[in-house]
UniProtKB/Swiss-Prot annotation:
This is UPF0349 protein GK2958. It comes from the Bacteria. Belongs to the UPF0349 family. InterPro entries: DUF1450, UPF0349.
Length: 78
């Protein structure tokens, strides 16, 4: 089972799209887009994704990608 990275379409429009594009190049991740992930306040404040159901954020797309990989290293699935 691969790690699941979930993005909100509103947050993609706010800037996390670049992070999603970078992560889609990794064949060891499942990337999913949703119309809304119900994190509206946080979504308006920062770039974010849900990583295996946990909120991970970053100030820039590059920082978001870095934080996602750090989260995956610190929280292995198995």
């Amino acid at each position: 089972m691969l790690p699941i990275i979930e993005f909100c379409i509103s947050n993609l429009a706010s800037g996390s799209y670049k992070a999603m594009e970078m992560l889609e190049k990794d064949p060891n991740l499942d990337i999913i887009e949703y119309s809304c992930l119900s994190y509206c306040t946080r979504c308006a404040e920062t770039l974010f994704a849900l990583v295996n159901g946990e909120f991970v954020s970053g100030e820039t797309p590059e920082q978001l990608v870095e934080n996602i990989y750090r989260h995956l290293e610190e929280n292995p699935m198995f």
